[in-house]
């Protein structure tokens, strides 16, 4: 396969390396990804994360395995194993569906390689288009709030919501970005803060519970988030805490935008209630672990509820920003999400 370099994925000498997002920002560690078992472990431990990136890493690994001569039957099983690794994010399912079609071709090895490379290039272009459409919604002097991480760390390109912030910043329209730390795994505090710093975008880090106070003071002009799955009625599954921000923004009459590629839309999912929500380990809530070490702050036997995602109802969303353009609440009420986009 051709060499590849993105913020979080490197392909060189027929080896796939992933940037360990659990080690950031203290350390920049590249980890090998030579087998399906390794990739599943990276996904489950969130070394690889972000809906688009998970799908791309799976596609690239499958193509590499095909080139190495792994039998077709084993690749078919690999598709099943990878599909089960992260149930909420639909990008993974969409990418695996396309790789499955490539595997069914008579010349399946080159077909899988070409499809994986096509998916990477498509994602880069999708990010650029999302940024262009979204930046048009950002007013000069804006103070924007974002949640979790939606930049180059989560995609092959400049990102989704962070891509919008970057494009608006390049246009001189961003005064400051408020970054939610995003408990319990701190993707905002660890990853988004790091990315914005690298990009030169002015930001301030806040605890999740501080967002309401900022909105009440008139310090937030709009909220920008990504998505892991968008249902046929416009409901959005995204990182836990997104729904809270949407409720707060609605109460304070602040625009709430979702930025995502069309591959995140799932017309076969009727509404948010039908989206499977991943439940994660209690240890993520009772303490914290990273390259800096581990710390347990709650009682060891404390009962914990730890969903990785929540669902934001379509009624709370001001606009869905896709690579194809901005979709309005009126269009959603008319059923635009009930058919495939793109």
Swiss-Prot record:
Keywords: Amino-acid biosynthesis, Isomerase, Methionine biosynthesis. Pfam families: IF-2B (PF01008). The record marks 148 as: Transition state stabilizer. Pathway: Amino-acid biosynthesis; L-methionine biosynthesis via salvage pathway; L-methionine from S-methyl-5-thio-alpha-D-ribose 1-phosphate: step 1/6. Its EC number is 5.3.1.23. The keyword Isomerase applies. The keyword Amino-acid biosynthesis applies. Belongs to the eIF-2B alpha/beta/delta subunits family. MtnA subfamily. This is Methylthioribose-1-phosphate isomerase. The active site is at 228 (proton donor). One of its GO terms (biological process) is L-methionine salvage from methylthioadenosine. InterPro entries: IF-2B-related, IF-M1Pi, IF_2B-like_C, Initiation_fac_2B_a/b/d, M1Pi_N, NagB/RpiA_transferase-like. It comes from Serratia proteamaculans (strain 568). GO terms for molecular function: S-methyl-5-thioribose-1-phosphate isomerase activity. It catalyses: 5-(methylsulfanyl)-alpha-D-ribose 1-phosphate = 5-(methylsulfanyl)-D-ribulose 1-phosphate. Catalyzes the interconversion of methylthioribose-1-phosphate (MTR-1-P) into methylthioribulose-1-phosphate (MTRu-1-P). Substrate binds at residues 49-51, 86, 187, 238-239.
């Amino acid at each position: 396969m051709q060499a590849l370099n993105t913020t979080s994925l490197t392909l060189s000498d027929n080896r796939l390396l992933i940037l360990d997002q659990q080690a950031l920002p203290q350390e920049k560690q590249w980890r090998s990804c030579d087998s399906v078992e390794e990739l599943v472990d990276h996904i489950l431990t969130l070394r690889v994360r972000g809906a688009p990136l998970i799908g791309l890493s799976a596609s690239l690994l499958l193509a590499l395995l095909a080139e190495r001569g792994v039998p077709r039957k084993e690749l078919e099983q690999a598709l099943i194993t990878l599909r089960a690794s992260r149930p909420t994010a639909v990008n993974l399912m969409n990418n695996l569906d396309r790789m499955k079609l490539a595997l069914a071709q008579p010349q399946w090895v080159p077909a899988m390689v070409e499809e994986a490379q096509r998916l990477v290039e498509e994602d880069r272009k999708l990010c650029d288009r999302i940024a262009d459409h979204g930046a048009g919604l950002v007013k000069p002097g804006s103070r924007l709030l974002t949640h979790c991480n939606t930049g180059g760390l989560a995609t092959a390109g400049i990102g989704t919501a962070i891509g919008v912030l970057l494009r608006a910043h390049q246009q001189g329209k961003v005064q400051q970005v408020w970054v939610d730390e995003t408990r319990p795994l701190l993707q905002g505090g660890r990853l988004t803060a790091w990315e914005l710093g690298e990009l030169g975008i002015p930001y301030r880090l806040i605890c999740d519970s501080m967002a309401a106070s900022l909105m009440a003071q008139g310090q937030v002009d709009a909220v920008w988030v990504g998505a892991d799955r968008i249902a046929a009625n416009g409901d959005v599954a995204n990182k836990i805490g997104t729904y809270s921000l949407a409720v707060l923004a609605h109460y304070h009459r602040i625009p709430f935008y979702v930025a995502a590629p069309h591959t995140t839309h799932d017309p076969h999912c009727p509404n948010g209630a039908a989206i499977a929500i991943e439940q994660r380990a209690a240890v993520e809530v009772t303490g914290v672990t990273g390259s800096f070490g581990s710390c347990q702050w709650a009682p060891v036997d404390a009962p914990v509820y730890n969903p990785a995602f929540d669902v934001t109802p379509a009624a709370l969303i001001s606009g869905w920003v896709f690579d194809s353009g901005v979709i309005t609440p009126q269009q959603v009420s008319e059923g635009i999400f009930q058919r495939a986009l793109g």
